[in-house]
Swiss-Prot record:
Organism from which the protein derives: Arabidopsis thaliana (Mouse-ear cress)
Name of the protein described by the UniProt record: Ferredoxin-thioredoxin reductase catalytic chain, chloroplastic
Subunit structure: Heterodimer of subunit A (variable subunit) and subunit B (catalytic subunit). Heterodimeric FTR forms a complex with ferredoxin and thioredoxin.
Targeting presequence: 1-31
EC number: 1.8.7.2
Higher taxonomy: Eukaryota, Viridiplantae, Streptophyta, Embryophyta, Tracheophyta
UniProt keyword Lyase, yes or no: no
Keywords: 4Fe-4S, Chloroplast, Disulfide bond, Iron, Iron-sulfur, Metal-binding, Oxidoreductase, Plastid, Redox-active center, Transit peptide
Class in the EC hierarchy, top level: oxidoreductase
Binding residues annotated for [4Fe-4S] cluster, in chain numbering: C85, C104, C106, C115
Disulphide bond pairs: C87-C117
Annotated site, Increases the nucleophilicity of the active site Cys, chain positions: H116
Catalysed conversion reaction: [thioredoxin]-disulfide + 2 reduced [2Fe-2S]-[ferredoxin] + 2 H(+) = [thioredoxin]-dithiol + 2 oxidized [2Fe-2S]-[ferredoxin]
Cofactor note: Binds 1 [4Fe-4S] cluster.
Length: 146
């Protein structure tokens, strides 16, 4: 887990007396940036390969896209117990996991082969590659500097 410290200053522009106080308050915010476990990444990698074969879809020609999505799914699997789509914004991720609509493969993918994340692409998609496989090393290499 990587931690980032961010400093924020809070000063007052004016006071009721018209005098600007010389004090300001500093607050530090710590943000945790988690990395998914290798086990979850491997589980999601294997799932993605199997689902691509089963659904007749292909990974993006840019394996970086595939890698980022797989890691996002793995991170959500670690955090919430289910591979919630990492390409959408949620007000309440835990509630979304419970509903199941956006758990991968999501309902639009299962019903219409529409993957918002571009993980599973139909052969006629301009961004579809020829591969239905990706190695653990490819995932590590393409996401190393993120």
């Amino acid at each position: 887990m990587n931690l980032q410290a961010v400093s924020c200053s809070f000063g007052f522009l004016s006071s009721p007396l018209g005098v600007t106080p010389r004090t300001s308050f500093r607050r530090f915010v710590i943000r945790a940036k988690t990395e998914p476990s290798e086990k979850s990444v491997e589980i999601m990698r294997k799932f993605s390969e199997q689902y691509a074969r089963r659904s007749g879809t292909y990974f993006c020609v840019d394996k970086g896209v595939t890698s980022v999505v797989i890691k996002g799914l793995a991170e959500h699997k670690d955090s919430y117990g289910a591979p919630l789509c990492p390409c959408r914004h949620y007000d309440d991720k835990a509630a979304e996991v419970g509903q199941g609509f956006w758990n991968c493969p999501c309902v639009p993918m299962r019903e219409r082969k529409e993957c918002h994340c571009m993980l599973f692409l139909t052969p006629d998609n301009d961004f579809a590659g020829k591969d239905q496989t990706i190695t653990s090393d490819e995932i590590k290499e393409t996401t190393a500097n993120m």
